[in-house]
Amino acid sequence: MCIGRRLLTGERLKVDPSLESYSREAHKNGRIRLPRWAVAGEVAIFLFFTVFFLIYGLTPYVGGDGMGLVGADEPRYAQIAHEMLVRFDSAHTIKGRLEACVTPYLYGHPWLEKPALYYWRAMFLFKDFGVHDWSARLPSTTFAFIMIGLIYLHMRRFRPGGHLDAALITAACAGIIGFSRGASTDMQMAAPLAIGLLGWYAWYETNSKFWLYDIYFFTGLATLAKGPVAPFLAALIIVAFAALRREWRILLRTLWWPGIVLYFAMVLPWFIAVQHLNPTFFREFFLEHNLERFATDRYQHQQPFWYYLVVVALAMMPWSVLAARALIDGIQKSIAEWRLRRSCNARPGASQPGDAFPEFLVLWALIPIVFFSFSQSKLPGYILPSIPPIAILTGDYLFRCRSSGLNRWILLSHSVLCGIMTMAVLLLPRFVAPPIVSNGAAAPPLSAHALIADLGASLGAVLLILLITRGFGLARLRLATCSVLVALMLFIYGIGPIFSIPPVSATKRVIHILDRTYSARPLADLIAGLAPASETVAVFRVRRDVEFGLSFYRNREVVNYEENGVPAEQHLLVARVTGRRGADLHTASALEEYLDGRHYERVASWPEQGLEVYLVGSR
């Protein structure tokens, strides 16, 4: 019986009677046997939406690689993987190739901020597909797909009925879509950690040692992705679960010697080797980039304590309303179970392993959020491990509510949220486009007709979800919501290409605006037409993402005037001349001081990012 039926008030949706018998049969037998055609259809739905959300617009074959690397981390990590590949290919002995895979290098200098798992995976993908920004993102995409697939299989095995909802909600939430397309280490840790924790719970429920391999193997991968935070979080979640259930013996049973040997056999070789080759590794990695990053604001990522509440709400879009209700439901059910266990009138055997899944998911969801809320450095990717359990809770909650119906206000709130998200996406080009477009003319104002069209589309999204859910049942809510997301992604990335089918060029406007506004790739293409790859490129007052982006796309470190001085030879200079809302940064007067009378002339302009490109003569 759905907990929400006892806790919520208000009129509920009419439920198809067949769903009630379906749900009762599911909970009675613990497994659901669907006809083969139904299983094939379910798998087809799962694969279509999952592949679309993870792949479309990422590669040149499906939707086009519409967005270059963004932020400072993506081009930096991609460049490290590229340099590792160069060192690997240039080595002629087994020892040399192994050493090339140990120490990450950035512009020829050791970069010891993160372990090497992402660099290894990106390096070999570069070897197979070439050095591209989209191939630099494939490590995250592939791990996300494996994680979502195993969520589907795990739920189908241990929580049948809600498995497709859980998998699709995971695949179709903003946090997973975004980080699965990132050339970063966040998904490299979150996905293996999620798989490992699901494996541990499978062991807890079945008592089969086979599943214990999961927690040790995948936690080992997560450790090689981000370091000791992975086993720390896994241990903290399991210990908290044992404490809540008062089953302390499971901690001793979890300490399984074959698993421990497997974990250290995976992790220790790289950590020992990198410490041997780089004596400063322990200080730089463990002390500076782990302890100091948590305890101080040295890296200037300070945010308020409640920051991650906002991040989680945005990461779960468009499922945030349902996710919040599911999380509250899970907390209430966990409290009820805890009180039942403490009650002196509790019947023997009332607390069975199957009853513990919501408690496990709630702890898994909340512990990373609470833990990193105390960190002095806060970045959105830190709480990515909390997204899968919240999505699973949401999928399981929706399935359990099929028999009792979903509160109308919750459904309406979910639909309205999807409408608001639709409106925000449709207005996105207006928010990010500069006040002056590339030809020097002012950007046209938003017309009344365009605004009415956007409002109509948003209202259409709301009505689509309401009508489909009311007409075909709660089981179709996932399809209606995912269909809205598909339409929004087509609006952002445009239509095509699909392998040999060419794209519809008129639909690519939005992604081109985003690419020119946030990525250095179009600017690097412009510079490539102005100067050969061997010519020096310098930057002045630009953001770090521009600096690292130009370095990756040119495969050569750019010179920063403020850090390295002015090169003596002739070079191209990229300087930021305007700030937000077109504010003048008085860059020209500052350049006069740096160049000290040297001749320079403007050769290109990049208004989307407030940049100018100059040709600076030799000294």
Predicted regions and their residues:
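Membrane-integral, polyisoprenol-dependent glycosyltransferases
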Residues: C2-G4, L8-R408, A424-V432, S500-I501, ...
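Membrane-embedded architecture of ER/inner-membrane glycosylation machinery
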Residues: D16-V39, Y213, A326-R619
